[in-house]
Amino acid sequence: MTLRIFDTATRTLREFIPLKPGHASVYLCGATPQAQPHIGHVRSGVAFDILRRWLLAKGLDVAFVRNVTDIDDKILTKAAEHGRPWWEWVSTYEREFTWAYNTLGVLPPSVEPRATGHVTQMVQYMQRLIDNGFAYEVNGSVYFDVTAWVAAEGSDYGSLSGNRVEDMEQGETDNFGKRGPQDFALWKAAKPGEPSWPTPWGEGRPGWHLECSAMATYYLGAEFDIHCGGLDLQFPHHENEIAQAHAAGDGFARYWMHNHWVTMAGEKMSKSLGNVLSVPNMLEKVRPVELRYYLGSAHYRSVLEYSEGALTEAAAGYRRIEAFVDRVGEVEVGTWTAGFEAAMDEDLAVPKALAEIHNAVREGNSALAAGEMEKARELAGAVRAMTGVLGFDPVEWGTQTDDSAAHEALEVLVHAELERRATARAEKDWAVADEVRDRLAAAGIEVVDTADGVSWKLQ
């Protein structure tokens, strides 16, 4: 069967035809590491990890680029508020994001470029836009001229988001000398105390949108297959990426995919609303593989409404799969069902794919009860193939029953130690607090103190 994906740009299901036969090129807008990652952040990573795994399963060679926005207004503000160097702040939370992705079984990207490492490419991109008449310099800043681009032949500005140009305002704070309210910064002139890099237009730092256009085309070429990201990036970020790229003469992304939000009580999960659930906090409730199962269980274009009940139900669903594979014993990866393939080829319809997995588990348990071991092994092999595509094959995760019990026991023991440490810190008994931390470190357990609380991970 042929994979069809929902292309946000055309608002239609389109057959995926790679630019280069046998290869797929994918760019995912990654982290802006300003704070601890929450499950809204990592849902995007899990959703498009499933896309990547399915492309690989269909025999394609996949170049997967996931960037890090390591210079940004919010990063500078957060670092300044806490009296920390911006680069230290970024490095701290970049490690947190990497840990979260790895813990949830997200495959590492082919390359993970940082914005600050690609200023040369950004300068070249800006020069092309200026030469083409779609960017201008004012007092050391460089802006994209939206009015000029909209008037140009072939312009499609606003088509991705559906916004009307006359209703758009970019919200740039440093807008002195801008020709129009819709114009956005490609390069921001240096301010005292802020990091900056030299350019032909003076010292400064990159604008958010320019970073991704420059990095995507540098690694994947002027035209590539799929650009992914969260729905909240559709405007202004992705709309402006397209404008820059097309104005520079690049074909850019041929398909656009956006995952929906994680919500709580109907509200989008965000730091500003104070309704975030950090990954470490979630891992106090369920195992990493169960959290991955939960985050990937809804269709990527659907809202995932968080509740304790839904999380518990998802964890129980995974354990049913795990228990069946454990009962069968050692089994090789088999072949997925036709229904599973049809579901995945229809815009990654994971809920339907999960139904196929659970049907196989039910049939397999019935086969075991009837003593039909050959049939049970065949079904377990199919389950391994299907769960492998979704990134939670129980055998690959090593989460058989004994390991689960050991993990739960470890959780209890570490939690007790952390409570003892918290009590000591509250009483300013630093010697005891340090003793607990050092004892855990000697056992290979790293204690992580963050603004959202304390968490732990195996070193």
Swiss-Prot record:
Reactions that this protein is recorded to catalyse: tRNA(Cys) + L-cysteine + ATP = L-cysteinyl-tRNA(Cys) + AMP + diphosphate
Gene Ontology MF term list: ATP binding; cysteine-tRNA ligase activity; zinc ion binding
Cofactor binding comment, as recorded: Binds 1 zinc ion per subunit.
Domain of life: Bacteria
Residue window of motif 'HIGH' region: 31-41
Cystine crosslinks: none
Subcellular location(s) of the protein: Cytoplasm
Keywords for the protein's UniProt record, in alphabetical order: Aminoacyl-tRNA synthetase, ATP-binding, Cytoplasm, Ligase, Metal-binding, Nucleotide-binding, Protein biosynthesis, Zinc
GO terms (BP aspect): cysteinyl-tRNA aminoacylation
Pfam families: CysS_C, DALR_2, tRNA-synt_1e
Residues binding Zn(2+), per UniProt: C29, C212, H237, E241
Record carries keyword NAD: no
Positions of short motif 'KMSKS' region: 268-272
NCBIfam families assigned to the protein according to its UniProt record, in alphabetical order: cysS
The protein's assembly and partners: Monomer.
Matches recorded under PANTHER family: CYSTEINE--TRNA LIGASE, CYSTEINYL-TRNA SYNTHETASE
Protein name: Cysteine--tRNA ligase
UniProt organism field: Corynebacterium efficiens (strain DSM 44549 / YS-314 / AJ 12310 / JCM 11189 / NBRC 100395)
Species lineage: Bacteria, Bacillati, Actinomycetota, Actinomycetes, Mycobacteriales
Gene field: cysS
